[in-house]
Design a protein with these regions (language model features):
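Conserved alpha-helical scaffold segments that buttress catalytic/binding sites
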Residues: 1-115
Length: 115
């Protein structure tokens, strides 16, 4: 018999990080290689103003610094998520020039910030 899939719905998108990190910590989901299915009219893949070491060292501090527009990229940098599937609603008239894209996310060697 297959295991049920847990579903979490949150109003502020970045609040889902608490659930993801808890599930990683309890080994309910893998530490890495996760696929994120994201339903939204915005990609939420902005770059938060955080040092890369914070992302890896202190998830609790990280959660205080991310917001609804930039919560996904730290999970990619940390290696938790390797694919984001963004489901853009057909009724949205924003960001109409979207297309499949590959991004590189890393650390600025001078500032130690996420880029």
């Amino acid at each position: 018999m297959s295991r049920p899939i847990s579903v979490v719905v949150v109003e502020r998108h970045n609040e889902v990080l608490n659930y993801i990190y808890r599930a990683i910590g309890s080994k309910t989901i893998s530490f890495s290689g996760l696929k994120l299915l994201h339903f939204d009219s915005h990609p939420d893949m902005g770059i938060p103003d955080v040092e890369c070491s914070e992302i890896l060292r202190d998830p609790e501090q990280l959660m205080k610094k991310v917001s609804i527009e930039n919560w996904i990229t730290p999970m990619i940098y940390a290696g938790h998520v390797d694919h984001v599937i963004w489901m853009h609603p057909t009724w949205s008239r924003q960001l109409l020039n979207r297309k499949p894209t590959c991004y590189s996310i890393g650390e600025d060697l001078c500032t130690k910030r996420l880029v």
